Amino acid sequence: MPARIVCLSPYSKKQVEDLLTGRHAVEVVTVPDPPAPEAVLRECTLAELVIGDKRHAHRLPREVLQHMTRCLLIQMPAVGYDVIDDRAAAEFGIAVANAAGYNRDAVADWTVMAMLNLIRRGSWGDRRLREGGWPKAEMMGRELGALTVGIVGLGNVGLALATRLLAFGSRVLYADVVERSFAGVERVSFGDLLELADVVCVHVPLSGETHHLIDAEALARMREGAYLINASRGPVVDEKALVAALESRHLGGAGLDVFEQEPTPMDNPLRRMENVFFSPHVGGATLEAEARVLEVVRDNLTRVLDGDEPSNVVNGVRLGARLRSFTPSPRPSPAHAGEGDR
């Protein structure tokens, strides 16, 4: 039988089929929008391979995973995988893999853009000019090279960001549970980073430990007039506490690509604040990053189809015997395709 692949991301059936041109026959199924938990359960129950939803609309909780007895791998076409109960997946022997690092340059670029926008009041000035103003006196800014920037989480994105900041001449600090060896970057405690940095950039995965990592207490420790940039996950920052810190002018501004609820509600006070730079969770959205993530998806699905362990597994599962008993049908050769129609 062909291997059944269920795609929960907004890729077409043909896009997925075109990725997998190897020696194994595959059956690709896509799940329609809007999100329908019953459709996800129905299709994923019969799947050997699942492409997770990069939009975070279709979720895979324990209640669905426990029925996915045929599934070997859930491949996220993203870095984050919080739409999947990865611990439950491990209990059921399902490997969960992500696309670590595929968008590091895109997100690092976005973060620098947000910083420059805030410290030079770029979007604010653009709006004033469009309204007929000429706010020259109000647009005195700062140079990025004169600032101390703190990076919370020096992973793939954090390292790419540090490289860019060093080129600007910034002093770069980082706080991470893991010590990294990177010339020109200084490791400090999380608390010291908050107190020393003119700009705090958050680049950590969402977990129980990082939920509301940036809370009222953390914001209060930041320097008067400092800026907060979040391009990781919305719930890493307590939005109510952030609103209070911005309204009180304790913070100079914030750059946000992610929110606690997405899309963020129209009545979110952040929407009306002049000192906030927004984008709708598109920090990693570039043509180059999209090409790379499709390569990661292709390579990992192909590895499993070929009988090899997947890479970038985030929940510690090795497929072992399950993989050895997985025998997808070979792809029909062109010479035999359509013979039944003769």
What is each PLM-predicted segment?
Residues 151-152:
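Conserved N-terminal Rossmann-fold NAD(P)-binding element of oxidoreductases
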